[in-house]
Design a protein with these regions (language model features):
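Non-catalytic substrate-recognition and accessory regions of acyl/acetyltransferase enzymes
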Residues: 1-73, 83-103
Length: 103
């Protein structure tokens, strides 16, 4: 299953970058799925939307970073996360990387 492979790749990234194993808590929803990561130095919530249904002005096949708090090197870690998604998202059919909120 594509979703499972994506989660495995994301968990591997988190393990290699931060040393956290199997950190992703995955929740299915009507649009795709969401991943919540709450670790000592990392607090992230990311939506993987196959179908946006017009919500939030996000296009279909979007990865939406809702929350990304890194205890150390926030800007550098966020750029690295974006690089990971830009490399891997085409493999799984995702076309857009977006952020939510922030005014």
């Amino acid at each position: 299953m594509v979703q499972n492979d994506l989660i495995l790749d994301f968990n591997l990234y988190l393990c290699e970058k931060f040393g956290y194993k199997n950190s992703c808590s995955v929740m299915q929803n009507a649009n795709g799925f969401c991943v919540d990561i709450r670790e000592r130095d990392l607090d992230c919530y990311i939506r993987f939307w196959e179908y946006s249904c017009g919500r939030g002005n996000f296009p279909d096949w979007s990865i939406i970073i809702v929350r990304s708090n890194f205890k150390k090197n926030q800007a550098e870690s966020l750029k690295d996360l974006a690089r990971f998604f830009k490399e891997y998202m085409p493999r799984y059919g995702y076309k857009y990387l977006c952020t939510e909120g922030g005014g």
